[in-house]
């Protein structure tokens, strides 16, 4: 599924080059948006594959996948309703917000934390999908119990590693994780601005 989706995105990625022949095109913003859409799509596919591995019914898998992606899309509004200032619960729920990292790319900023987040979601969901499929291959026996324990511990380690990686990347300074690729460098401080700020004596 990802291969088919990637082929579609690759074809779509040609459009900025075609439009460039007819005028000025912000190439950085265009391709960052395409990258964000590809990562978001791959994460959504990973969600659907994981849910499909939990049930043998295609209808149930489709309904649950749609519900999960819809809730994820609405998670930003849900967290604002719970607490506008933010608390521990909203921080935990924000981990399930697939759309917020996508929105970070829309202004032409290459957000490394968002890329790591999407790759983590894709990797952990694919891992859980494989674990779910492998679990069905074992019949109820003593060997199954030992395998289940191994899988549970392996899953816990994978989840913990995913959380640690995202926390480490999130703790990095924004100047190293956010790259301004906008056409007019909207999010960068120019040399003229730096010179003007050096002459300021009062707080702005």
Q: Which sequence ranges carry the predicted segments?
A:
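Internal/C-terminal transmembrane anchor helices
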Residues: 143-171
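Secretory targeting signals
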Residues: 2-59
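Cytoplasmic juxtamembrane regions at transmembrane-helix boundaries
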Residues: 1, 60-64, 130-151
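Hydrophobic alpha-helical membrane-embedded or membrane-associated segments
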Residues: 4, 8, 41, 118, ...
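Hydrophobic alpha-helical transmembrane segments
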Residues: 30-35, 62-63, 115-119, 152-156
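Juxtamembrane extramembrane loops of integral membrane proteins
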Residues: 164-167, 171-204
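Terminal transmembrane helical anchor/hairpin motif
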Residues: 61-132
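Hydrophobic/aromatic residues in alpha-helical transmembrane segments
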Residues: 46-48, 128-129, 161
């Amino acid at each position: 599924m990802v291969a088919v989706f990637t082929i579609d995105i690759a074809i779509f990625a040609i459009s900025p080059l075609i439009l460039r022949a007819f005028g000025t095109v912000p190439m950085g913003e265009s391709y960052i948006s395409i990258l964000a859409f590809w990562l978001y799509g791959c994460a959504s596919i990973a969600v659907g594959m994981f849910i499909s591995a939990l049930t043998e019914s295609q209808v149930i898998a489709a309904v649950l996948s749609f519900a999960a992606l819809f809730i994820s899309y609405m998670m930003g509004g849900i967290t604002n309703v719970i607490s506008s200032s933010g608390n521990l619960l909203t921080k935990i729920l924000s981990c399930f917000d697939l759309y917020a990292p996508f929105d970070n790319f829309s202004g032409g900023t290459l957000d490394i934390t968002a890329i790591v987040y999407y790759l983590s979601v894709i990797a952990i969901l694919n891992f859980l999908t494989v674990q779910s499929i492998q679990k069905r291959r074992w019949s109820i026996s003593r060997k199954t119990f030992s395998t289940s324990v191994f899988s549970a511990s392996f899953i816990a380690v994978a989840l913990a590693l995913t959380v640690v990686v995202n926390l480490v990347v999130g703790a990095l300074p924004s100047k190293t994780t956010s790259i301004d690729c906008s056409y007019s460098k909207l999010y960068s401080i120019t040399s003229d601005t730096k010179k003007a700020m050096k002459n300021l004596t009062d707080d702005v």
